[in-house]
Amino acid sequence: MTTSADLATRYRRVLPSFLAPYYGEPISIDRGDGSYVWDLEGNRYLDFFGGVLTTMIGHNHPAVTAAVQSQAAKVLHTSTLYLSEPMIEFAEMVCEVSGIPDARVYLTPSGSEANDAALLLATSYRASNQILAIRNSYHGRVFSAQAITSHSSWRSTSHSGLQVQFVHGGYRLRSPFRDLDDEAFTAACVDDLVQVLDMTSAGDVAAMIAEPIQGVGGFATPPDGLFGAFGKELSNRGILFISDEVQTGWGRTGEHFWGYQAHGIVPDMLTFAKGVGNGITLAGVVARAEIMDTIDVLQFSTFGGNPLSAAAGIATLRTVRSEDLQGNAKVMGERFADAMRPVADATSWIAEMRGRGLMWAFEICEPGGIEPDKARTGEFHEACRRHGLLVGKGGLYGNVVRLAPMLNVSAEELDEGIAALRAAIDEVG
């Protein structure tokens, strides 16, 4: 029988070294059901990361599985050269829930490509290659997305055709404004934005792109209203606002369907990916028609909106809405916060617990300060696994543990995860 160790050996032989699986002894994922996965050895784990927030409503969800199986028996692929009812129906659903007026959607296979398309639209619409992004941001692995990623451990190159400036925003713990209250913090960030625009731009910036909650950046969560305050300054100068909803969309934050809705702003564009396919590759960019129609040459996507992915997206989005999984995210998120915040406050090496809905993170530092403790983060991550819980890592210094349960997680499953976290914290000491 093949073992996880066998697969790890084969993995290292054929895959690039920059792909680093989790854990000192990597585990295989052989099968899943609901909030649980099993490895090849039959060990069961409670999955609080969902393949980086991508399995969103549970492994092997019956509605998604049935939709994919039904579509696979008809046709797997058509491309955008032909009419496809699943693609059109999914696009209609996304436009309806986007909140963007007169919306159009361009479908892609990944969030990186969605952000690339948004940048193409913005720079074409504004006839400018100048982009604003947020410090500690991550927007993908394609060439253009690397330029707007403010995260040294994820930037493979400094070369770019874009002129990018980074402003203060989401990552409050290490901000020079961290001791300010929400209102003063927001005002200071707006002042920084104005100064960057006045000092470093040529006056015709194309767009700002921002994550409402920074994903790879360790679920760094800005004060509500920050991007709305930015938006007032941007709109005065004709600058577009792009909300990267790859990790925050579809009700994940509980209080809102989209992360941008916490900020009193409607973006000119939003990008999405990950969870809406519940594990099947599906992404896209939504924009007002006048922006989308800026591109007047032929465009094409081989795999974007393919029938199989669209079928998965339709089933996932229907489930999210019909079962009010946004509401469940809010209730379960509050349950998680009530249980874990006292534990985090009492743990000297947890510098900050942050997040909302079903997006939570612990930033792990030297006791009593904010010096990153990457080694202890690794110990905690391994301890969670030993207690049967799969969680993610992230943060600028690799010292953040991220948790993102399924949107339909039950109270019993959540409590099981909380018990595992407490046990892991006790083990690390």
Spans of model-derived segments:
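Conserved N-terminal phosphate-binding loop of PLP-dependent enzymes in the Aspartate aminotransferase
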Residues: 1-429
